[in-house]
């Protein structure tokens, strides 16, 4: 009989859910059953929730499908019994359409279920766009795991990515997106990662849709020192947050009416920031002489009060600024006031942790353009997923991007689709890549005419159309100065300005170009023979770029030919003239002196002269020329040109007017002391330059002499890494180090490299850690007068005291965000770890520094607004139909 009654109640509840689900809209919901087999219905209605789930096949182009072990299926809802797993590729991404600027709940479910029979749950990273969201470790998660976040997308496209970090295979079971109410879950900065969402009831059941119209998932919780109260009356929930009515019909009060009602949670990192949302409703019938009134305290400090819960209606009290918990222990207390006759109550509450996503996504127009190109040519490259440019280690094959600074979206500067099997005409979507410098469409099957729009792309320096089947006449406008156009192997393409023969036929471009190329080759050979006769040289001669704008010559496969060809070779007399006979010396080193100069009468340059007495200097000179001819990044000092004439060797750089970072820490030479926020930005920009050398160059480079005097500052205090004389290339293959003669600056030198002569990119990371410590402390790297002479030893000893103020530069006068300071200090010590394997990569360093900068900027913005701040640090939101009582 009891069993029949249970089944009847279950049937009634199921019918009620279906009825409510039909009444409540799922508009904007994305509910993906990942790995749903093609032979199963899609969409389908999940019976317990009434939610409509669909196959994920239309939202991702990679992966294989699997199913948890059959004996485990009864423990999970249907969507969690299947999964999509990703044995191929480093990063695999879902592409979802969302509403730009609106807060969304994003939730993923991961259930291993021993689908592969190996009994080894995988570990991998979860990304939201270009930023890390969570690390998923299913080794001990029998019931799986379910990370959730509140996030405001900056575009109408959202990418959720699984990133392989080890030997195991990433997988996903369910992916859900829910648009939230306007103006809810807002932060000063960053997104909100769910920590707790609980309602207070002795029931074991959890709540979600349709009880919660936003499909937030609520777990029940009850403490042994509490007493439950409840009501059968209808409770209004019509404020912006709309917690489930079911959650509001129960509440907790302390059993000891005089005691506080306490909720506690622990923080792994004491610097973590939290937002708290507490939901109250008076569900008891109070007598005329009864009053319920209490204050809310967070970590012993008044959070809000007094609180008088509204009768059978909702009030939500929330923090509008982030909160931290000293020592990592968080404590929320509700304490009755002196005039209250009843203990405090709490119906439900939510706690979220702030997570920063500092990496800006690639320019939205560029992303749209390159995805249109991908769709037009039906390109199916495994790594063409999510953001095209960032993180840099996942940049799409065939692209190069510029990262001007940490507050500007990356832009696409190179598109290389050579030998990609392209067919059809040259798509007009290319013209929307408005910062494109290099376009390579060679060795495909493209047809039609060369489009006129290419001539309107003023940023283009190189266009390679070789090896296609293009026809018609090349637009005359593509002969503009500074543009290199290559079109060999298009027999039906007609060169601009070519004349018809007497028979009325145009000369094909290959003949014209061959004659021109032959003539140039003869001139070059004569010139080389003449120069050899005149004076033999042990240095390779680099010939200047031909001035003819349109030539049909074989395409060079250098990574950045447009950049390399722009470097100008100067004569010694030109160097003498530009420096006014070396009249203004602005620096000096072991290689020689650096003089100020001007090119073309206006462009300021720094001329680095090689001393004839410097034997090491000549090797460094050649290394620096070789490196700077093939690298280009906004945070690396640009090479304007060079001089290589007999015994006269010089490098001509852009002039960086604000000197080096060391001067702006010490105040030497009257330089202003930079504040903490500027230091963090400079550090992040220098880190971007190093990251480019490590993973953006082919082959990768190690700087080998990172120090504060080699970080220069331009007129806007943008950081530019300089002095590449000791730089070395790495093999592209499996080896991650090279053996070299020890070189570098004492104090900054990687101790592991010093003892083993094995150089790797982690050697730069160590040096950068020392630079960070200098920026934080303004202490000398080596000071023999200190008890701990090396800066890492001194900082390590001071860390034992736990007082950041004793470590920070006194010239900052305490004007810094302590959270960002601690985080930067921990990062610096991690970089300067004696063991290279324990040091982070520069990509990780960049992310950490960006997050530090976001924290510091948030503090500065808040402090600037304190004088005009009209709203309290806590906000109270009432039932929309209720007028709050006066106090």
From Swiss-Prot:
Primary localisation category: membrane
Cytoplasm among keywords: no
Localisation per UniProt entry: Membrane
GO molecular function, one term: protein serine kinase activity
Membrane topology field: Single-pass type I membrane protein
Stretches forming LRR repeats: 411-434, 435-457, 459-481
Enzyme Commission code(s) on record: 2.7.11.1
Entry-annotated residues carrying Phosphotyrosine: 653, 753
SUPFAM superfamilies: L domain-like (SSF52058), Protein kinase-like (PK-like) (SSF56112)
Glycosylation sites: 143, 230, 256, 289, 338, 363, 400, 416, 432, 445, 464, 471
Reaction(s) the record says it catalyses: L-seryl-[protein] + ATP = O-phospho-L-seryl-[protein] + ADP + H(+); L-threonyl-[protein] + ATP = O-phospho-L-threonyl-[protein] + ADP + H(+)
Signal sequence, renumbered to the chain: 1-23
Ranges for domain Protein kinase: 580-853
UniProt: ATP binding residues: 586-594, 608
Sites bearing Phosphothreonine, chain numbering: 571, 740, 745
Keyword Glycoprotein included in the entry's annotation: yes
GO cellular component assignments: membrane
Positions annotated as active site in the UniProt record: 705 (proton acceptor)
Database matches in PANTHER family: OS07G0107800 PROTEIN-RELATED (PTHR45631), PROTEIN KINASE DOMAIN-CONTAINING PROTEIN (PTHR45631:SF133)
Name of the protein: Probable LRR receptor-like serine/threonine-protein kinase At5g59680
């Amino acid at each position: 009989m009891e069993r029949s009654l249970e089944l009847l109640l279950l049937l009634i509840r199921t019918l009620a859910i279906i009825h409510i689900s039909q009444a409540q809209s799922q508009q904007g919901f994305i509910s993906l059953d990942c790995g749903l087999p093609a032979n199963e219905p899609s969409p389908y209605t999940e019976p317990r929730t009434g939610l409509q789930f669909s196959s994920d096949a239309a939202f991702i182009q990679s992966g294989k499908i699997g199913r948890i072990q059959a004996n485990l299926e009864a423990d999970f809802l249907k969507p969690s019994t299947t999964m999509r797993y990703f044995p191929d590729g480093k990063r695999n991404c879902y592409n979802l359409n969302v509403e730009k600027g609106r807060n969304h709940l994003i939730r993923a479910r991961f259930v291993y279920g021993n689908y592969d029979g190996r009994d080894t749950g995988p570990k991998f990273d979860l990304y939201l766009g270009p930023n890390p969201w969570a690390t998923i470790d299913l080794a001990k998660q029998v019931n799986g795991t379910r990370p959730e976040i509140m996030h405001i997308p900056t575009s109408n496209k959202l990418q959720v990515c699984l990133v392989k970090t080890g030997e195991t295979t990433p997988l996903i079971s369910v992916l859900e997106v829910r648009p939230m109410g306007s103006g809810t879950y807002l932060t000063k900065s960053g997104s909100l990662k769910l920590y707790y969402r609980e309602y207070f009831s002795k029931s074991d059941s959890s709540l979600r849709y349709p009880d919660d119209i936003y499909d937030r998932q609520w777990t029940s919780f009850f403490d042994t020192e509490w007493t439950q109260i409840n009501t059968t009356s209808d409770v209004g929930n019509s404020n912006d947050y709309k917690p489930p009515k079911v959650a509001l019909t129960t509440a907790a009060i302390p059993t000891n009416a005089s005691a506080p009602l306490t909720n506690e949670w622990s923080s792994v990192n004491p610097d973590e920031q939290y937002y708290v949302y507490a939901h109250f409703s008076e569900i008891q019938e109070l007598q005329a002489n009864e009053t319920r009134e209490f204050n809310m305290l967070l970590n012993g400090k008044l959070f809000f009060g007094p609180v008088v819960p509204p009768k059978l209606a909702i009030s939500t009290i929330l923090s509008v600024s982030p909160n931290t918990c000293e020592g990592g222990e968080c404590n929320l207390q509700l304490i009755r006031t002196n005039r209250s006759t009843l203990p405090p109550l709490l119906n439900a509450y939510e706690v979220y942790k702030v997570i920063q996503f500092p990496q800006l996504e690639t320019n939205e127009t560029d992303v749209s353009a390159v995805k249109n190109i991908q769709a037009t040519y039906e390109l199916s490259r495994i790594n063409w997923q999510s953001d095209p440019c960032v993180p840099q280690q996942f940049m799409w094959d065939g692209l190069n991007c510029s990262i001007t600074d940490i507050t500007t979206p990356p832009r696409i500067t190179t598109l290389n689709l050579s030998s990609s099997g392209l067919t059809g005409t040259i798509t007009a979507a290319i013209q929307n890549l408005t910062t494109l410098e290099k376009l390579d469409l060679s060795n495909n099957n493209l047809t039609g005419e060369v489009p006129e729009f290419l001539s309107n792309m003023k940023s283009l320096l190189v266009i390679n159309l070789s090896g296609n089947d293009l026809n018609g006449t090349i637009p005359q406008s593509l002969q503009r100065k500074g543009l290199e156009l290559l079109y060999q192997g298009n027999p039906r393409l007609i060169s601009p300005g070519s004349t018809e023969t007497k028979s009325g036929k145009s000369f094909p471009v290959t003949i014209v170009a061959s004659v021109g190329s032959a003539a140039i080759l003869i001139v070059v050979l004569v010139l080389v023979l003449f120069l050899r006769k005149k004076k033999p040289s042990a240095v390779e001669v680099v010939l200047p770029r031909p001035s003819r704008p349109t030539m049909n010559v074989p395409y060079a496969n250098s990574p950045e030919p447009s950049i390399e060809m722009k470097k100008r070779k100067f004569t010694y007399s030109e160097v003498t003239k530009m420096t006014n006979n070396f009249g203004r010396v602005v620096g000096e080193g072991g290689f020689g002196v650096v003089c100020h100069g001007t090119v073309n009468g206006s462009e300021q340059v720094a001329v680095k002269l090689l001393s004839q007495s410097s034997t090491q200097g000549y090797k460094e000179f050649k290394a620096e020329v070789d490196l700077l001819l093939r690298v280009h990044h906004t945070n690396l000092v640009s090479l304007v040109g060079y001089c290589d004439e007999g015994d006269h060797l010089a490098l001509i750089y852009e002039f960086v007017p604000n000197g080096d970072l060391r001067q702006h820490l010490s105040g030497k030479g009257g330089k202003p002391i930079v504040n903490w926020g500027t230091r963090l930005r400079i550090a992040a920009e220098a880190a971007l330059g190093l990251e480019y050398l490590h993973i953006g160059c082919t082959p990768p480079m190690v700087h080998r002499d990172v120090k504060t005097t080699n970080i220069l500052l331009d007129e806007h205090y943008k950081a530019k890494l300089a002095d590449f004389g000791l730089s070395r290339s790495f093999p592209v293959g499996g080896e991650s180090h090279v053996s070299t003669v020890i070189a570098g600056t004492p104090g900054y030198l990687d101790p592991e490299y010093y003892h083993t002569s094995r150089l790797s990119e982690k050697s730069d990371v160590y040096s950068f850690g020392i630079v960070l410590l200098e920026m934080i402390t303004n202490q000398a790297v080596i000071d023999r007068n200190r008890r701990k002479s090396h800066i890492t030893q001194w900082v390590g000893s001071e860390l034992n005291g736990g007082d950041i103020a004793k470590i920070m530069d006194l010239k900052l006068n305490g004007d810094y965000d302590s959270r960002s300071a601690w985080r930067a200090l921990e990062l610096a010590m991690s970089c300067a770890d004696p063991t290279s394997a324990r040091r982070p990569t520069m990509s990780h360093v960049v992310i950490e520094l960006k997050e530090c900068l976001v924290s510091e900027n948030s503090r500065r913005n808040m402090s600037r607004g304190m004088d005009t701040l009209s709203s309290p640090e806590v906000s109270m939101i009432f039932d929309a139909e209720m007028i709050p009582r006066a106090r």
